Structures are given as C-alpha cells and as structure tokens.
Amino acid sequence: VGRTLITSTRYFPKIENCGTSLAQIVTSEPVGPWKDIMQGLVISISSAKKYFYIQTPYFLPTEAVLVAMQTAALSGVDVRLMLPMRADNRLTHLGSCSYLADVLYSGVKVYFYKKGFLHSKLMVSDDELSTVGSTNVDFRSFEHNFEVNAFIYDTETALQMREIFLQDQRDCVQVFLKNWVKRPWYRKAAEIVAVSYTHLTLPTTER
C-alpha cells in the first residue's frame, strides 16, 4: 500500500455517454470551505416557483435550509416534506419532530409515511430539477459527513421523481398544525431534549 495516484484506464475506463440528461455531481465534506450540497439545496428551494417536494428519513435542518423552506411556503410555493412515521432511531425521530411546528406555521405540508421505514433522500422541484444521493436533510449530512448528491436538470427525470413522491404520499397521513400543537407537553419536552442531544451525539455514520 502506497500513496501513488492511480490514473490508469485499466482501473478507470473511459465513460461512454448513455443519455442526454444534464447532471451535476456535488460532494460535501467537513474539511472543505463550502457546504456545497446544503448551498445547492438552499438555492433550489429559493428558486422554486410552483413546488418543492422533499423526502428524507431525518429532518434536523440547518437555519439556512429551514428559512429557505419557510420563505418558499410563505411565497406561495407548494412545499411538501415527507418523513417516516416510525424511524430507525427514536431519538433522531423525536428531534426531527421538534422542527415540524416551525415549517407547519409557514404553510409547509408535512406527511408521515406509514408503509414501513422511509429511507429515500429525494427532492424535486417545478418539473425541472431533482436531486438524489446520500444526503439527509440534517445538519450532520450538510456540515460534518462526507456526502454526494446528483442534481439532475431534466424534465423527464423530474416528472418521474415527482410521481414517486406522489405515489408514496398515498401511503401517508398528513400532519395538520391544529392537531400538531395539541400533542402532550411531555412529548414536546421529549422533542426538545432529543434535538439538543442529537446535536451532540448523532453518529456521522448514520445513513
């Protein structure tokens, strides 16, 4: 094992074109000067004119992403957020729930997927842009983990992604603000404790 840079075509054969869609591969890492995927997401949300749909297993957004979602919804954009009803990590799920009132107040539509665990990381906007990859909508993915996403600028792909979202939405229950604010005080307290704890302990290996 050495530090020789391997560039031989034996290991990296030439890639042939296999389609016409324009895709931008974006990476993020904790040691870089920019949070590229988060910045791409913020720009995408802020640029949406009609709709922006998000599927993510964990929702612990940075302030920039949260404000972008709220601003878009307040501007009349149909912003939808889909989360699993039951997550694989209860603490993280409680932390995610602590942010829901913030987005519901601004008009974001929130859905809990009830047909198993939702692990999709999909975002689609205006039948023009979609992005998929390893990134969760959480601060660890944006700021601390090594992640990669494809931003795809193609109508056909966006329509397919939109249809996937809408099909999954049929297996969801919608969360309404008037009901959400009535959850018990001890549940709200648990969410506050959970979100504080996850900011300190959410494992960087969580995917």
Regions from the PLM with identified roles:
Residues 1-200:
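Charged, low-complexity intrinsically disordered terminal segments
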Residues 199-207:
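Single conserved hydrophobic/aromatic residue that forms the stacking wall/gate
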